[in-house]
């Protein structure tokens, strides 16, 4: 049996369900960033984590190998959906200002080599897709158009995998560029072919979906009382079978996660960041 190691972020006191054949081991590590951490983003090689405040003000990074924390920007919205370049040496992100009551975003680029940043796009009221500025292959939910923009090697198409009139979020392409996972606001988490065909329902609650390889997706499964989130735990889904494995329990409220290859990092409502290693058998 081939054993594949996946590194996941998790909170202390959590446990994995060993009844699922794919999970064989787990341990937990807390990452001390010296402040509250929310909305994590991982570099392509999994060495650096971007994080921000609960309301996305400011953008910081931590190198998981050296534990060095760096302040990238302190302006509003800087932590909303930042994107690494392919080699991980730079990050592209937005900041926000208000002019005459209208929010306007600009785009900035930060270098981890020079530790400097520069504005690469002036403030505009238009919607900015940072993914398109760092990659030619990506997927992006166009909420206003009720579609998903899929770009493969720079060729862009708009698709509606489960039909028109839906609000698509958190679209992500599998590492082998064959599958697409996405969330629909009211319908849940789905997987489809890259052209949107053969869409398959995975679960009714699946926020922040991330591919850990070509076969497994992790996501946040939440519950609410109609007003606020009351519980949130990380689940792993085998996309071929739809089998769901709970990786954490309800003891800690998770508010964000990110995954790259063998690593997942997530944060809690208290602003804590954790790393958890598990083994998944294929």
Can you say where each PLM-predicted feature lies in the sequence?
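Sequence signature of WD/YWTD-type beta-propeller architectures
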Residues: 20-282
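Sec-dependent N-terminal signal peptides
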Residues: 5-14
């Amino acid at each position: 049996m081939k054993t594949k190691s996946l590194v996941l972020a998790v909170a202390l006191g959590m446990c994995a369900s060993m009844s699922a054949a794919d999970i064989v081991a787990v341990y937990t590590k807390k990452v001390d960033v010296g402040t509250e951490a929310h909305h994590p983003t991982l570099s392509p090689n999994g060495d650096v984590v971007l994080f921000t405040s609960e309301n996305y003000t400011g953008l910081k990074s931590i190198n998981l190998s050296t534990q060095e924390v760096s302040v990238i920007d302190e302006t509003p919205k800087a932590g909303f959906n930042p994107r690494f370049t392919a080699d991980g040496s730079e990050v592209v992100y937005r900041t926000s200002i208000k002019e005459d009551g209208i929010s306007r975003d600009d785009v900035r680029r930060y270098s981890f080599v020079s530790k400097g940043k520069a504005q690469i796009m002036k403030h505009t009221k238009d919607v900015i897709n940072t993914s398109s500025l760092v990659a030619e292959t990506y997927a992006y939910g166009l909420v206003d158009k009720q579609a998903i923009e899929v770009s493969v090697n720079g060729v862009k198409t708009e698709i509606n995998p489960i039909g028109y009139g839906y609000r698509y979020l958190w679209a992500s392409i599998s590492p082998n560029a064959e599958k697409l996972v996405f969330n629909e606001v009211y319908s849940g988490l789905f997987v489809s072919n890259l052209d949107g065909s053969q869409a398959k329902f995975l679960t009714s609650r699946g926020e922040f979906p991330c591919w850990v390889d070509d076969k497994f997706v992790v996501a946040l499964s939440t519950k609410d009382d109609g007003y606020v989130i009351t519980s949130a735990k990380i689940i792993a889904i085998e996309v071929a079978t739809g089998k769901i494995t709970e990786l954490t329990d309800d003891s800690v409220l998770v508010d964000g996660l990110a995954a790259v290859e063998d690593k997942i990092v997530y944060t809690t409502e208290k602003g804590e960041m954790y790393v958890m290693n598990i083994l998944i058998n294929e």
